Amino acid sequence: MDSSTSLLPPLGSIILACEGLTSLVPLILSVMVCLIATVTISPTLLAYFNDPFELRAYPGPFLARFTSAWISWIISQNRWSETVDLMHRQHGPIVRLSPDHVSVASPAAFAAVYGHSSGALKAPFYNAFANFKIRSIFNTRDRAEHSRKRRVEAHMFSPRSIRALEDTARVHFQVLVRQWDALCAPTGKTVRGSAEGTLGTISWKVHGDRVWFDCMPWFNFWSFDTISDLAFGRPFGMLEAAKGSAHVSKSNTKSVQAVSQDTSHSNEAQSELLEIPAMEVLSELLDFTVALAYLPAWVQPVFGRLPMFRDGYDAAPKLANLSLTAVANRVASQTDRADMLSELLRGRDEEGKPYGLEELSTEAELLIIAGGDTTANTSCATAYYIARDLQIQAKLQAELDVALDGVESDVAPYDAVKDLPYLDAVINEGLRLHSTIGAGLPRVVPSGGMTVLGQHLKEGTVVSSPIYTLHRNEAVWGKNAYEFYPERWLEASADAKKEMMQSFAPFSVGPRACLGRSLALQQLHILLATIFHRYSLVLENNAPAQLPLRDGFARKPMKCIVGVQRRK
């Protein structure tokens, strides 16, 4: 026998050793589980019993005392705004949402948290929205950085700049009208009023004298095409194709090369394109981001790889690529066309510095998110309410018929409809019940603390005030606060109207209020005036009593089937 071989342990000894280790596996696993539980639970229990922010006295869900996972679960179930509102109705104006977070619901509280005099900064929640290393004007938590960006970008959304883009936006209203006219055409040609088919990805069916289809995708097609044209000089082409897709470069690298203005690479960057379902990508990313945003930072990457979050996790690089491709296309065109990106390219901060590549891209991504989804959501919800109540629709159409009498264009001119009292009331009521974001966005109480509703909140406490609940305060809006009633804006006394306006914040308030307010209001006026002057809309007989929503970050309608007919 070889001497080296004799040094090896006998085979039987090895087998016995392995069997011994195998018998220890349950014990090892038990120890690991205990260690993980200790690491996870101990800080939770310590925070609860130590109560560093002195929030134990405030009511709220039992689990919210121990962990932020409660609110993440509610968000993942698409019940964010409505659940927090229910908590306030049950427990009062101050509700605890997590170990360090309280929600405060009143007009005074909203102003205290978000107003110009508030020293509160955005919470770590916003870190989850960072898809680039450089933050956007929305997700930056640094006050000085936000001020710098606001100075650069404010002119882009000024009323004068928005008016200059009206003719560009009009093109997409015209395409929407043309497509809806095409859908309505079979109603006059069918035998016994029945036919069905598809236009792009949209199924339609004629029943009686109306064509029935889901209008929600159309509002998204319109908003995505509008913002991509206004921002980057060309539409995504969703309206024409009736399809929620966009084309991106097959690699971020090629988009970056084009944006860097190295023209030797620009053709290469445009040659290999990939079609992505942009509307789905945006929805998946927002749902994923908000569901994880309240969890500890170290947990987020782990949860992001779970099967239930996989689509959202994969959506982040796709949306980044979409913004990079949009910027690349615009820069490679070398046009002097006036649009939002040209404003960003010309913009300079107080030191005379322009935006760099990554900063352009992160702001472009924000334009796609804000412009592609938010106005579409409010438009669809408002159309749902109008289609549900034919008396409201008749009043609106009577006002529009007078205002647009003699107007030859298929699209309502903004100047003709911007000051119509009943249209204004309808839009305000739509924004009240379906503001872009219903949940309270979190802020961190600054040094020295903050007093809200007579209660002192310690420095570092996270505080939010929900728009959804603010807009349904019965003390301000009356017993019918949960109902769509445009007349409330016309019937209120001067004092009541003043109180209503103090409790009306669809675009938030203060230094972090939405810069796109003027654009959104212009688009809502033109869209709703154009649609309801040209068409009659009704809901199905078995339509749900409430519009089905994905109530996560944005309150997104899931579906809205309407019966559409051209008006005589």
Swiss-Prot record:
A GO MF annotation of the entry reads: monooxygenase activity
Q: Please report which protein family the annotation says this sequence is part of.
A: Belongs to the cytochrome P450 family.
Organism source for this protein?
Postia placenta (strain ATCC 44394 / Madison 698-R)
Name of encoding gene = CYP041
Q: What does this protein do?
A: Cytochrome P450 monooxygenase that is able to use 3,5-dimethoxy-trans-stilbene and 3,5,4'-trimethoxy-trans-stilbene as substrates for oxidation.
Co-factor(s): heme
Q: What is this protein's name?
A: Cytochrome P450 monooxygenase 41
List of glycosylated residues: N321, N377
The record's annotation in InterPro entries points to:
Cyt_P450 (IPR001128), Cyt_P450_CS (IPR017972), Cyt_P450_E_grp-I (IPR002401), Cyt_P450_sf (IPR036396), Cytochrome_P450_monoxygenase (IPR050121)
Q: Does the keyword Thylakoid apply?
A: no
| Transmembrane spans | 21-41
Q: Could you confirm whether the keyword Membrane appears in this record? A: yes
Keyword terms of this UniProt record: Glycoprotein, Heme, Iron, Membrane, Metal-binding, Monooxygenase, Oxidoreductase, Transmembrane, Transmembrane helix
Query: Which terms in the GO cellular component ontology are assigned?
Result: membrane
Any idea which positions bind heme? C514
